[in-house]
């Protein structure tokens, strides 16, 4: 498959880098959270509140199955998508997985800097919860094809494109 799949913690820059990568590579962008919101005609926050997290994770799994037929896409995943149901292995079948690694301290700065009311798992800017989430997820994220330290936006873009082309044999 010739897709790039961006994974990482909430606030790691998946959506922002995804938009730029799609322009550079001339690939369509698929944001899995946005796709779910469109399918459900509800925000992620509303879906969690009305139906619960399990329902949301089922929707993510359905999207993964649909994406298996796609190519030439940049796919920006929700932070939890690779974690549940061993989805990381399915994502690796879909395309070149890139873990956007951001130090915990930087994630906390980003969270505190901006109120993230739309992210149900980051409500109330709970730094302890973010720290626990980070510790629980990092091992799975590191199963990606490559790891990019995403603290410098332009360098991250260049490195992702270069590494992806090498992976493709270009």
Curated annotation (Swiss-Prot):
Pathway named in the protein's UniProt entry: Metabolic intermediate biosynthesis; chorismate biosynthesis; chorismate from D-erythrose 4-phosphate and phosphoenolpyruvate: step 5/7
Any Pfam family hit: SKI
MF terms (GO), sorted A to Z: ATP binding; magnesium ion binding; shikimate kinase activity
Top-level division of the source organism's lineage: Bacteria
Cofactor note: Binds 1 Mg(2+) ion per subunit.
GO cellular component terms attached to this protein's record: cytosol
Localization terms from the record: Cytoplasm
Catalytic activity from the UniProt record: shikimate + ATP = 3-phosphoshikimate + ADP + H(+)
Stored SUPFAM superfamilies: P-loop containing nucleoside triphosphate hydrolases
UniProt binding sites for Mg(2+): 15
UniProt keyword annotations, A-Z: Amino-acid biosynthesis, Aromatic amino acid biosynthesis, ATP-binding, Cytoplasm, Kinase, Magnesium, Metal-binding, Nucleotide-binding, Transferase
Residues binding ATP: 11-16, 119
Cofactor(s), by name: Mg(2+)
GO term, biological process aspect, one: aromatic amino acid family biosynthetic process
Record-listed substrate binding positions: 33, 57, 79, 137
EC number: 2.7.1.71
Quaternary context: Monomer.
Family: Belongs to the shikimate kinase family.
Functional description taken from the UniProt entry: Catalyzes the specific phosphorylation of the 3-hydroxyl group of shikimic acid using ATP as a cosubstrate.
This protein's name: Shikimate kinase
């Amino acid at each position: 498959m010739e897709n790039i799949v961006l994974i990482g913690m909430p606030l790691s820059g998946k959506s922002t880098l995804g938009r730029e990568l799609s322009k550079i590579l001339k690939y369509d962008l698929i944001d899995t959270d946005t796709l779910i919101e469109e399918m459900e005609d509800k925000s992620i926050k509303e879906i969690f509140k009305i139906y619960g997290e399990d329902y949301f994770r089922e929707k993510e799994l359905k999207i993964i199955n649909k994406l298996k037929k796609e190519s030439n896409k940049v796919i920006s995943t929700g932070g939890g998508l690779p974690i549940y149901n061993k989805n990381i292995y399915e994502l690796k079948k879909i395309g070149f997985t890139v873990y956007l690694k951001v130090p915990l301290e930087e994630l906390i700065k980003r969270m505190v800097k901006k109120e993230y009311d739309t992210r149900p798992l980051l409500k109330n800017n709970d730094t302890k919860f973010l720290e626990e989430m980070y510790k629980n997820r990092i091992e799975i994220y590191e199963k990606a094809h490559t790891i990019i330290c995403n603290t410098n936006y332009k360098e991250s873009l260049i490195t992702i494109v270069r590494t992806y082309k090498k992976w493709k044999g270009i």
